[in-house]
Amino acid sequence: MTVIMMKQLVFFIVITVIASCGQNEPLTNYEPKSPQEQALKSILLDFQDGVNTLDAKKIESLIHPKASLMTGRERKTLSKEEYVKILPKRLAGNPFIALGKPKMTVSGDKAEVKIYMTRGNYNGLVVYNMILEDNKWYIQGWKY
């Protein structure tokens, strides 16, 4: 192996490690950088707990009334009202989830949280759109 090839290999490994940072680190280990991030982390931990304890009411309380939520392999978008109707069945039919280390962008009363979610054999990026209303953060939508 030539020196140039060796340098390229090392560079590729370093980039891969940097790109995957946070994917396997749990949300519980995330250190928020602001009170807003702390509140968002709490909402996401509550969401994770609600899914894992099959608590549809807990999840419902985290979702904004005007939410638009992506669901299923077909990536159909549902209102909160539509989603809540299918939620108990979805919870019963899916494995537990684990949320990873997030990347949060907060701007006024809106926030975007990019986070890896593991569910069974699936590990993929989910983008949560959050909204602050009456001093409380809500999930306004998500996509994957």
Predicted segments, located by residue:
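Sec-dependent N-terminal signal peptides
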Residues: 9-18
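Short, low-complexity N-terminal intrinsically disordered segments enriched in polar/charged residues
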Residues: 21-53, 61
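Surface-exposed, charged secondary-structure patches
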Residues: 81-127
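Short beta-strand edge/turn micro-motifs at domain boundaries
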Residues: 123-144
